[in-house]
Swiss-Prot record:
CDD domains: Ribosomal_L25_TL5_CTC (cd00495). It comes from the Bacteria. It comes from Salinibacter ruber (strain DSM 13855 / M31). Residues 198-250 are annotated as: Disordered. PANTHER family: RIBOSOMAL PROTEIN L25/GLN-TRNA SYNTHETASE, ANTI-CODON-BINDING DOMAIN-CONTAINING PROTEIN, RIBOSOMAL PROTEIN L25_GLN-TRNA SYNTHETASE, ANTI-CODON-BINDING DOMAIN-CONTAINING PROTEIN. GO terms for molecular function: 5S rRNA binding; structural constituent of ribosome. This is Large ribosomal subunit protein bL25. This is one of the proteins that binds to the 5S RNA in the ribosome where it forms part of the central protuberance. Keywords: Ribonucleoprotein, Ribosomal protein, RNA-binding, rRNA-binding. One of its GO terms (biological process) is translation. Part of the 50S ribosomal subunit; part of the 5S rRNA/L5/L18/L25 subcomplex. Contacts the 5S rRNA. Binds to the 5S rRNA independently of L5 and L18. HAMAP family: Ribosomal_bL25_CTC. GO terms for cellular component: cytosolic large ribosomal subunit.
Length: 250
């Protein structure tokens, strides 16, 4: 953390998500190949693959709605996949989206193995209102999730981070977190920063601009009038001068 803070924050307080609380997804076997995949997608389902250390790679299909819920759920992507009477505790390891519609095209599920750590991405949940924000600062949340390596029984639903003590000028990084498992995200990754408010200059109104233009024009006109008065003789004086010269040379 940067700034004046000499203290060490302990912001990490994971909310455990037992695998038994994971959503259940009903899957069906599927054929492989591009033609079969297109037919599956046309029926609002997604072709998937399930694999694991002790699980043979298994092609399957699931409802697109079930996958969308898992993708956009604000918790660890853990699920129970059921097919033909078998159940696997899994994580959503990877998925592909259509580049234009964001429709899921394919997904990979990794079966969780007892005693084997698994690497997955878990959402961050920031709690508290920074002191700096209460004093007019702006809180910028840079990171929304972290990649961690953890045993299946210790997978957190979210990574809860307390940012209430941050003042203006403070930043929170991955290396500030105290965890009981390995964080794969770079230690130098900034999570949150609190910056001073931006002072905006009041925009000049059209009326003020017109008034300034008129004032400049008036000043210019007054200057021309002064030059005329000082540099040119009056009409009477010019006539008198001309007459005197004629009389002198007659």
């Amino acid at each position: 953390m940067t700034g004046h803070l000499p203290r060490l924050l302990s912001p990490f307080s994971p909310d455990r998500l037992p695998v038994m609380d994971a959503p259940v997804i009903e899957a069906q076997p599927r054929e492989t190949g591009s033609k079969a995949a297109r037919e599956i997608r046309n029926n609002d389902r997604v072709p998937c693959v399930l694999y694991g250390r002790t699980v043979e790679s298994t092609p399957l299909q699931i409802p697109i709605a079930a996958l969308n819920k898992l993708i956009y759920r604000r918790s660890a992507p853990v699920a129970e996949v059921e097919m033909n009477g078998d159940t696997w505790n899994c994580i959503l390891k990877d998925y592909d989206l259509h580049p234009l519609t964001d429709r899921p095209l394919h997904a990979d599920f990794q079966a969780l193995e007892e005693g084997d750590e698994v690497t997955l991405t878990v959402p961050l949940n920031y709690t508290g209102i920074p002191v700096g924000q209460q004093n007019g600062g702006d809180t910028q949340q840079i990171a929304r999730e972290l990649t961690i390596s953890v045993l299946p029984e210790n997978i957190p639903a979210q990574i809860e981070v307390d940012i209430g003590e941050l003042v203006i000028g403070d930043s929170l990084h991955v290396y500030d977190l105290e965890t009981d498992y390995e964080i794969k995200t770079s230690r130098d990754q900034t999570l949150v920063t609190v910056v001073a408010p931006q002072i905006e200059t009041a925009p000049t109104t059209e009326a003020e601009e017109e008034e300034e233009e008129l004032t400049e024009e008036e000043i210019a006109e007054e200057g021309e009038a002064v030059d005329t008065e000082e540099g040119e003789p009056a009409e009477g004086e010019e006539a008198a001068g001309e007459g005197g010269a004629d009389e002198e040379y007659q």
